[in-house]
Amino acid sequence: MSKRKDIQKIMVIGSGPIIIGQAAEFDYAGTQACLALKEEGYKVILVNSNPATIMTDKEIADKVYIEPLTLEFVNRIIRKERPDAILPTLGGQTGLNMAMALSKAGILDDLEIELLGTKLSAIDQAEDRDLFKQLMQELDQPIPESTIVKTVDEAVTFARDIGYPVIVRPAFTLGGTGGGICSSEEELCEITENGLKLSPVTQCLIERSIAGFKEIEYEVMRDSADNALVVCNMENFDPVGIHTGDSIVFAPTQTLSDIENQMLRDASLKIIRALKIEGGCNVQLALDPYSFKYYVIEVNPRVSRSSALASKATGYPIAKLAAKIAVGLTLDEMTNPITGTTYAMFEPALDYVVAKIPRFPFDKFEHGERQLGTQMKATGEVMAIGRNLEESLLKACRSLEIGVCHNEMTSLSNISDEELVTKVIKAQDDRLFYLSEAIRRGYSIEELESLTKIDLFFLDKLLHIVEIEQELQMHVDHLESLKKAKRYGFSDQKIAEIWQKDESDIRAMRHSHSLYPVYKMVDTCAAEFDAKTPYFYSTYELENESVQSNKESILVLGSGPIRIGQGVEFDYATVHSVKAIQKAGYEAIIMNSNPETVSTDFSVSDKLYFEPLTFEDVMNVIDLEQPKGVIVQFGGQTAINLAQSLSDAGVTILGTQVEDLDRAEDRDLFEKALKELGIPQPQGQTATNEEEALEAAKKIGFPVLVRPSYVLGGRAMEIVENKEDLREYIRTAVKASPEHPILVDSYIFGKECEVDAISDGKSVLIPGIMEHIERAGVHSGDSMAVYPPQQLSKQIQETIAEYTKRLAIGLNCIGMMNVQFVIKNEQVYVIEVNPRASRTVPFLSKVTGIPMAQIATKLILGQTLKDLGYEDGLYPQSQLVHIKAPVFSFTKLAQVDSLLGPEMKSTGEVMGSDTSLEKALYKAFEANNSHLSEFGQIVFTIADDSKAEALSLARRFKAIGYQIMATQGTAAYFAEQGLSACLVGKIGDAANDIPTLVRHGHVQAIVNTVGIKRTADKDGQMIRSSAIEQGVPLFTALDTAKAMLTVLESRCFNIEAI
């Protein structure tokens, strides 16, 4: 069957901001799909609220709308554009839920719009727990005993019948949100109550727990002619009970017999056929390790995180082909883009092992609940490819960027056996390292298997790694041992550690014996056919398949796994940089380790190396490719941190030079540079120990801002008000980077703004100034930003532009630079300079129309701004107002305080644009899910230093019809000033405290501030948690509340008696 001619215009729904459970994999899927549909001649309309994506670039679709993904706005766009069809399956859970909402509102029927890919009935059957159960029974597919409940009492009754433990799964939620394993009635009541609230249809599935079974996933495709195939099967290292997004995963499956594989494969194909899905689908199954008994856990009737992993693991472009299937093409008439000769109907075969390890945010959230369960907590993931499991696992470990180069954390050697066993049983994000430590201590793999239910096969591989470590210890400088260790994925750094040498000694020894890695191609067919793809991984074998071309090449380093502080924005810059390199006539090579992103799509670059971003792995690629140079500006802190060691090894770093990078990062050098350039900065000093820090604070005067140098995303940054707090900070936080000193700065509580600039060394283009809504003290990544600035005088803007220019030229910046300023009493101070692409590049590129990363790359390659037709200085402002607003994932992270401060906590961003500030703010709040009713009750619980400011806000809220509620101290202050407020009870006062009022739906918003120090108190944290759990808008900075008030006031009519 060929493609459909009866539809011309297709709307694609994106997945919105990055949150835990829904990350960059949907940017990858959406980009692929839009391009595939355009390739087939359809007109594509894209709607997505996330500006930090490649998908929302103008050239990806015919029309791109960056608007809130709410029924109100999507409906408007549909009525304006009148698409013939909508493709919702590439927008994750957001896309599916939007399709359901459009259907329920009657919009699809009313406008005669068809849903492509997955029919509504299939979404319903896969997502609605009751219908899913019925379908499985019809297909004779086993599922765990379960019941659907709409109340907590129903859950309790069922659990009493079948016994504990049970699993709670809310319907229509993402990444296991609201679910969990319950081993007691108390846990069941709590989790079910929460789950029912989070489910849009107030429905939960309560099922018998099959924790301990093997968790297996099949990624399947089907077309309209009922052809179906398995693209990839994957096996979780962790048994059932831990969300697959938080599990280590291997592809292909490692421990299944042929019979088991065929049995589960048949089940998966039977399910996709019954659902009549046209496109991709993910089936999760649980297999009893001791029999042929299995259960179907769940089905995702859409492209998912696992399909991004499967695409990268096999090279088979699932999203691209799913989009083409949705418009009627069939698997037997499309060629596989990797080989160019075989058809898409040909199931991929792998002659290597792929390992995926999740990346968790607990380096940022030290107090977060780290125990893993059915609710996802990872922000991103890394993938590595090897010829054996050990090699791929160890490569993945060193890709994580958590300070390890092996499956070993040195700090664990000091813990007691008792703690070790507890951590092995109760899985946390770092269980792999505890398991490996247990094996090093001599625990048998049989003991560990009975404690963890992890398959002996996997534990035996961990044992094998430890045996190689022991062999290396016994045979120092032994060539055969070195060869063996390299074959199984050991890094030079680890071997050096064991042999008590420097990493450079191991590298020299390898080179003297011509022991280099070779690069193998990912070709989907286990080398059975010729492949055309330039997609490679390293291994220690004989035949090298990556041939150096005659063209001069440039290597771009990616940004590794997505984590808080380093998100998809850096991938955006990487992809744009590659486009510019190709346009300039060079071969563009990408090196990255993140399977979710667009940059690791093999069609983006001329060559892709899927490798860890470590000195050794990067140097190996450089030794083979001999590029003209390496670009480190677009890979965030990951790439910048490699610049020095690469430069020391004689590699050409293109763009800003290492010594200039150092002048921006090193405190003393930076201060000196600012003095020379005549640019003011907050008074500050460097300290290497407690005494120096106290001395510095005394000299500067409290409050001071303290932080380690060389960090990203405000890691371990705090505002301290007195000596005791400073001592406490130094004892707990300074370990963030021991060889670098800490910085002690005068804390200026003023207006913040930031600038991204592009420099060729002589001229500087400043696309725009972004003004932060929150004052200093909230991390720039967590602030709402406005462009163009609304409250900065022309003079201040000119000063900012002038300082930016001086900095760019004075620091010899070639390419990108980001500068942050604080303004107090009309005086502009520089807070920090980052001589690299920052997280605001995609936003600013979109709103100004300047392709910043591409221009920066052209300058890095030797062109000037004048050559490119750009003037020196501040670019003319946009006529519209644009807001960038942060998005948080607190619902997924128990015990992480949602109080905003100098350490970054947001996982993603949205954008709102319109003709006025109020309209743009309204869109931004709608897009990040902070919908506030026109009237209701608002609670104020305010620190002393901001009560006066809060009073004027409370008066304005009252004027538009809100009832003001307040805690004791705040209510008393308001009353003194003539504003009466309803008193709420102290925490623990069961009937009237804030958490209880919130739970019963009596509170529409909470304003809660904690004073300049921004540290959490227990009561405050309970209040904030209750707001997060119940989805009540919470403002921990008065500026954000003021912005929301501006929106509400603009939507109110003036009602006054005459």
Swiss-Prot record:
Is Secreted one of the keywords?
no
Residues the entry annotates as binding Mn(2+) 2: 298, 300
Listed pathway(s): Amino-acid biosynthesis; L-arginine biosynthesis; carbamoyl phosphate from bicarbonate: step 1/1; Pyrimidine metabolism; UMP biosynthesis via de novo pathway; (S)-dihydroorotate from bicarbonate: step 1/3
What keywords were assigned to this record? Answer: Amino-acid biosynthesis, Arginine biosynthesis, ATP-binding, Ligase, Magnesium, Manganese, Metal-binding, Nucleotide-binding, Pyrimidine biosynthesis, Repeat
* Domain (MGS-like): residue spans on this chain: 930-1058
State where Mg(2+) 1 binds: 284, 298
**Swiss-Prot/TrEMBL domain comment:** The large subunit is composed of 2 ATP-grasp domains that are involved in binding the 2 ATP molecules needed for carbamoyl phosphate synthesis. The N-terminal ATP-grasp domain (referred to as the carboxyphosphate synthetic component) catalyzes the ATP-dependent phosphorylation of hydrogencarbonate to carboxyphosphate and the subsequent nucleophilic attack by ammonia to form a carbamate intermediate.
Protein's name in the database: Carbamoyl phosphate synthase large chain
Name the encoding gene, please. Answer: carB
